[in-house]
Amino acid sequence: SQHEIEDILTIGKEMIEKPIELLDGVEEVLQKLKKNYTLIVATKGDLLDQERKLEKSGLLQYFHHIEVMSEKKEADYQKLIRHLDIQPRELLMVGNSLKSDILPVLKIGASAIHVPFHTTWAHEEVSKKDAHESTFKTVHSITDILRFL
């Protein structure tokens, strides 16, 4: 109905206008890393929406490249590495999802640091066995990654 369509449009508009909330220390970490590393965003989702979020966050200036993927599986990361013309050992992924940020990257020979977030989508959860068979660092705050670099 017309009323339902209006409700959907209102919800969509509210989502777009919702302010971006940065985790503590994110900008400080990006400032430090940008001095010595090429920073890339690798994310899933809609290209325009992800670019808008980065622009709105004020963090776009720190990134050399934005890669918006339909999936984040081994093949997608291999494609990214080819596109960037780098070797897997030159890639360090920092992410909050074991399933899509950490494990596929490790399987292609890259490194990873897991920064758990207090909420994880159900489809992003992995078995303890899968997580423990892999070698990656886990930190509790984004600022902790600076200790490893």
Model regions and ranges:
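Short, acidic loop-to-helix structural element flanking the phosphoryl-transfer center
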Residues: K13-V41, E74
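A metal-dependent, Asp-based hydrolase signature
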Residues: S1-E14
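Short alpha-helical segments used as structural interaction elements across diverse proteins
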Residues: T10, V41, L47-Q50
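Asp-based, Mg2+/Mn2+-dependent phosphohydrolase catalytic module
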Residues: Q31, D46-L149
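Small side chains
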Residues: G12, A42, A110-A112
